[in-house]
From Swiss-Prot:
EC number from the UniProt entry: 2.5.1.75
Pfam short name (any one): IPPT
Superkingdom of origin: Bacteria
Co-factor(s): Mg(2+)
Marked site: Interaction with substrate tRNA: 103, 129
Keyword match Nucleotide-binding: yes
Organism field: Streptococcus uberis (strain ATCC BAA-854 / 0140J)
Gene3D superfamilies associated with the record: P-loop containing nucleotide triphosphate hydrolases
Role: Catalyzes the transfer of a dimethylallyl group onto the adenine at position 37 in tRNAs that read codons beginning with uridine, leading to the formation of N6-(dimethylallyl)adenosine (i(6)A).
Name assigned to this protein: tRNA dimethylallyltransferase
Molecular function, one GO term: tRNA dimethylallyltransferase activity
Annotated PANTHER family: TRNA DIMETHYLALLYLTRANSFERASE
Record-stated family: Belongs to the IPP transferase family.
Length: 301
C-alpha cells in the first residue's frame, strides 16, 4: 500500500495570527504556504484582505495570493483545483505544504473531498448543508432510509455527505483527500479576539484601507471582490451617507460577527485541535506537535 504524504492546515477566525504562525511553521519545517482565503486571491486588494506583506512573502513562499483580477469570480471549486495543484507541486520539490486560511467552505471542501462540479452553485450546496446540519441524528437516519442510502459506518458527517451526494449527483464528486493532514486551529476568549479585531481595523485604516476601498468603489463597485468585509462597509461613507467613524464601527462589528461565524464553522463542521493564542508559548507547542506528526509513520493509503 502506498503511504499518504503529509500536509499542515492552520485555521481560525480573522486577526488571530494565522499568517505569522504559518511563516514560523514554514521556516521550521522547510514548508511553503497555500492561502486558504477567498479574498486574498485578488490582485490590488492587500490591506482589507490582511494579505501577507511583501516582507512576509519573502520570508516564506506563498501560493494562491494575487492569482485573480478583481473583476473575476472565485469559488470553492476553483480553490480545490488550485490547492491540489499547489500541494502536488510543493511535495514534488521535497517541501511541506502548509494551508493557512479562514474560509471554512474552501478548507472543508478540500479536506473532505468535495470536488464541486462546474454546474453546481456553491450557495445551493451551502444552504442544503446547513439544512441537513440542523436535523437530529434520528431525522438524518429517516432521510437516509427514505432515499435508500446506506453507510458501512455511520457518523453525522458521513451521513450528511452521502445525502448531499444523493441530492447533487455528478455535480458533487466525492473523492477522498489524498493526503494525511494535521488540522490546527487558533482561538481564545471571545473578548480577547474581539479586542484584536478592533486593533486590526484601526491599523488597516492607518495603513491606507480607505484609499484601497475607494479605488475599488470607483472602478469596480459591483464585482464579487467588493462584497468582502473591509470594503463594503466603507462604500456608504464614500457616498456621504455615514461618517468615517460610523463606517469604522460598522467594519469592526461586521468583522467580529464574521469571526464568530468562522469559529462556529470550524468547531461544528471540522475536527480541529485549537490552541489558545494568549498563551505566550503556543507557537512552540504547535511546532513540537507538528514535529511529532511529521515524524510518525505516514498513514496507509
Amino acid at each position: 500500500m502506498t503511504k499518504k504524504e503529509k500536509i499542515i492546515v492552520i485555521v481560525g477566525p480573522t486577526a488571530v495570527g494565522k499568517t505569522a504562525l504559518g511563516i514560523q511553521v514554514a521556516q521550521a519545517f522547510n514548508g511553503e504556504i497555500i492561502s486558504g482565503d477567498s479574498q486574498q486571491v485578488y490582485c490590488h486588494l492587500d490591506i482589507g484582505t490582511a494579505k501577507a506583506s511583501q516582507e512576509e512573502q519573502e520570508s516564506a513562499v506563498h501560493h494562491l495570493i494575487d492569482i485573480r483580477d478583481v473583476t473575476q469570480n472565485y469559488s470553492a471549486f476553483d480553490f480545490v483545483q488550485d490547492a491540489l495543484e499547489a500541494i502536488k507541486d510543493i511535495l514534488s520539490r521535497g517541501k511541506i505544504p502548509i494551508i493557512v486560511g479562514g474560509t471554512g467552505l474552501y478548507i472543508q471542501s478540500l479536506l473532505e473531498g468535495y470536488h464541486l462540479g462546474g454546474n453546481l452553485d456553491q450557495s445551493a450546496l451551502l444552504a442544503y448543508r446547513q439544512e441537513l446540519e440542523s436535523l437530529s441524528d434520528e431525522a438524518l437516519l429517516d432521510l437516509m432510509a427514505e432515499k435508500n442510502i446506506s453507510l458501512k459506518e455511520w457518523t453525522r458527517r458521513r451521513a450528511i455527505r452521502a445525502i448531499e451526494l444523493d441530492r447533487f449527483g455528478k455535480d458533487l464528486q466525492n473523492q477522498e483527500f489524498p493526503y494525511e493532514f494535521m488540522l490546527i486551529g487558533l482561538n481564545d476568549d471571545r473578548s480577547y479576539i474581539y479586542e484584536r479585531i478592533n486593533q486590526r481595523v484601526d491599523q488597516m485604516l492607518e495603513m491606507g484601507l480607505i484609499e484601497e476601498a475607494k479605488w475599488l468603489y470607483e472602478h469596480y463597485p459591483q464585482v464579487q471582490a467588493s462584497r468582502g468585509i473591509g470594503y463594503k462597509e466603507l462604500f456608504p461613507y464614500f457616498e456621504g451617507e455615514i461618517s468615517l467613524e460610523e463606517a469604522s464601527q460598522n467594519l469592526k462589528q461586521n468583522t467580529r460577527r464574521f469571526a464568530k461565524r468562522q469559529l462556529t464553522w470550524f468547531r461544528n463542521r471540522m475536527d480541529v485541535t485549537f490552541y489558545p493564542i494568549s498563551e505566550e508559548s503556543y507557537p512552540i507547542r504547535i511546532i513540537n506537535d507538528i514535529k511529532i506528526f511529521l515524524e510518525n509513520k505516514a498513514q496507509d493509503d
